[in-house]
Structures are given as C-alpha cells and as structure tokens.
Regions:
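Membrane-embedded alpha-helical bundles of multi-pass transporters/translocases
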Residues: 1-220
Length: 220
C-alpha cells in the first residue's frame, strides 16, 4: 500500500485526465498531439512521483513507525529496506501506465501483453538466480530487486512499442526523463535520509523527531 501511494495519487490521476486528449487525438489521426500529451504526461508524472518516492524512501522508517508503532525496530528496518529497494521501479511504472493509454486509445492491446511478458520472465530468472547465490536472509531483497529491474525494463520496452505505433515518439526523450528524475530522486532521498538519521528518526522515544511526533499526537 505504501509503495503504490505515489502512483495511485499522481500517475493514475494524470493519466486519467490526459487519456481523453490522447484518445481524441487518436480518433482524429493526430499523432503529433498524441505524442505531445504522452510525453507531457510522462514528464509531469515522473517529476511528482519520483519526488514522492524520494520522500517515502528517506522517511521509510518513520512511516512504518507510524503505521505500526508496536513493531520491533528490526521489523521496521526490514520493511523500510524492502520499500527502498522497490521504489526505483516506480519510474518504469509511470512510463508503463502512459504507454498503455496510448495503446488503448488505438484499440491495440497486444503491445501491453508483450511489454509485460518478457520482462516478467526475466524477473523470474533473475530472482531465482539471485536466490542461488544469496544467503536465505536476503532472498526477499533479491526478489524485490528483480521486480524493480523488471518494472524499469518494462517502462523502457514500452517506449519502443509506442514508437512502433507513433514514429514521432522518440524513446530517448522518455528514457532520458526516467534517468534524470530517477537520479534526482535518489540524491534527494539520500540527503533526506541523512538528515533524518542526524535528528534521530530511528528512535521515536528520545529524539527531536520523537518529541515532534509526540507533541503532534498529543495535540490531536
């Protein structure tokens, strides 16, 4: 649920709003408008989604402390690590959801199937391969890493399927946005994580963060 918040709030909302324009342009045969709205949707969603992903990644442990205050710190750290591993996959998920809108507007579901098929098979292979070489305690992290790679590959692959239908859609424009906003999110997340660690976000009982949260909940 926490992982899907950025996509549910941002990507789905923007994709729903732009789908009407994309579908209308498809009905009129206006490929230029389709490409423009597709790229605008991807860029704006990547900006906001990866911003939210950076916040969630940096504040992963405080978030899980709020959701499960009675859980042990070790459990929260494990949840937080799992969340951080899969968050980069949101970049691919953003591109996928807008690429799907392009295919749906052209009433062609085949690219959607193939976009998911091959990366998913690769995910299974990569996941099992990592499990062969990792200690059992890291198997879950290996599986999550494989899922993240699969989502990113799905996003990249979908841009080429879009170009096959819309020659004006340059895949590298979208891929460049994925890399740019992904790198910014990673940098911002690391800075935020460092700042929270400095003020003591990992212990809600005897820290500045704990005092803030305690005061907030008492006020509520």
């Amino acid at each position: 649920t926490v992982y899907m918040l950025p996509q549910s709030i941002v990507s789905v909302s923007i994709a729903t709003a732009l789908f009407t324009k994309i579908a209308s342009a498809a009905a009129d045969g206006n490929q230029t408008s389709m490409v423009r709205n597709y790229q605008i949707g991807v860029r704006s969603s990547l900006l906001l989604t990866m911003w939210m992903a950076a916040i969630l990644g940096a504040a992963a442990i405080p978030v899980f402390q709020i959701l499960g205050p009675s859980n042990a710190i070790s459990e929260m750290v494990a949840y937080a690590n799992a969340l951080v591993i899969i968050l980069p996959g949101l970049a691919g998920a953003v591109v996928i959801i807008f690429s799907q809108r392009v295919f749906y507007s052209m009433e062609d579901g085949r690219p959607v199937f193939y976009t998911v098929l091959w990366p998913t098979l690769g995910q299974v292979v990569l996941g099992w391969t990592l499990m062969m070489f990792l200690p059992p305690v890291y198997w879950l992290f290996g599986a999550l890493f494989a899922e993240t790679v699969s989502r990113i590959v799905q996003g990249v692959l979908s841009t080429y399927f879009v170009r096959a239908r819309l020659p004006q859609a340059n895949p590298w424009v979208v891929i460049g946005d994925m890399v740019k906003y992904g790198a910014i999110a990673v940098g911002a997340g690391l800075l935020g994580m460092g700042a929270l660690h400095f003020v003591g976000a990992f212990d809600t009982s005897n820290t500045v963060t704990g005092a803030i949260w305690g005061g907030f909940w008492r006020a509520v």
